[in-house]
Amino acid sequence: MKEIVFENISKSYGKTKVVNNLNLTIKEGERLIILGPSGCGKSTTLRMIAGLEEPTSGKIYMDGKCVNDVKSGDRNVAMVFQNYALFPHMTVAENITYALKVHKLPKREIDERLKQAVDMLKLNGLEDRKPKDLSGGQRQRVALARAVVKRGDFFLLDEPLSNLDAQLRGHARKELVKIHEIYKQTFIYVTHDQVEAMTVGDRIALMNKGDLQMLDTPANVYNKPRNIFTAKFIGSPATNILNINYNRGYMSIGEQKIMIPEMWRDLIDEQGNIGLSLGIRPEHIELTKEKNSDAYMGTVKYIEDYGNKYGVYFEIEGNEVIAVMDNCDLKSNDIVYFLPNFEKIHLFNRETEISIGYPKELE
């Protein structure tokens, strides 16, 4: 199987560890997104796959073979960089076909692959231009075409859309998925953009400070976050995190308490005596001005108008919380009542920051 396996991989630069004991299997033919903030180790991980960086410890397997000592040029990968890395003195066609000519493929094969890539990525009529005569979006498509024609077993993309405007990024995301559906290569795609990750990926590997935080489908990363970092990083506005106290079926925020459903009581009781944090997404909060003794009471601080929705910032016992609402008749200093949707909340161990509902075998 043409899969990639990281076995206890670490990478350090001097005393700085940028990837920490990474264990990860990238399945044959999938689109895996390596997502995370700047400095999390995602690009270093990709460069180790490409052979541009050597791991400090651990082993990398590609197609069942350890490749720690295999040179980059012998790994059968195609890579697209953030800065395109086009040869400025070559035409579009020459840039796209350069690697094919180096490997001495027959001219007919080269011409066929060039035509397919040019047609697919809408580069018709640009074949004789130099990179300086192209827009940023066109240069990006040339870089993608160059990787497509190589048809390596593994397609590596390092922040490939970060230099494009929003409209071009949306189009390019669809083109990348289309390319994958045609060639069925294994895609490993690095980005800091959660929209790209959610729309392009079959699975997301979320990293932070060199550690793998969660590996799962986009839906599960969003709806079933493994830990507080995942809950806050995925989604905008970010998930609200509030420290709570639990006692005999009641969940307290400061001096206010409400009873919680039995399913959550049983799960909390199984954890023993631990501190808890409540996580709830802004879009899963409902606010009302009607007094409700079974809800938390807060005060509206300010409201943001997003055009199609509203962001309502309110305060509960000194904690700032944001709710996203379709319609809003609230104003600053209004008293509001908030009852969590217990089917949508997340409870985390305050010390480990791991979800108490996350399957232990996946931790």
Feature annotation, model-predicted:
Residues 5, 25, 61, 337-339:
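ABC ATPase nucleotide-binding domain
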Residues 31, 72-82, 86-229:
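ABC ATPase nucleotide-binding domains
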Residues 35-37:
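The feature captures the beta-strand-to-loop junction immediately N-terminal to the Walker
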Residues 50:
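Helix-to-loop junction immediately C-terminal to a conserved catalytic motif
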Residues 56-59, 109, 209, 345:
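Conserved coupling/switch loops of ABC nucleotide-binding domains, chiefly the family-specific signature
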Residues 58-66:
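Conserved ABC transporter NBD signature motif
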Residues 250-363:
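Non-catalytic connector elements of ABC transporters
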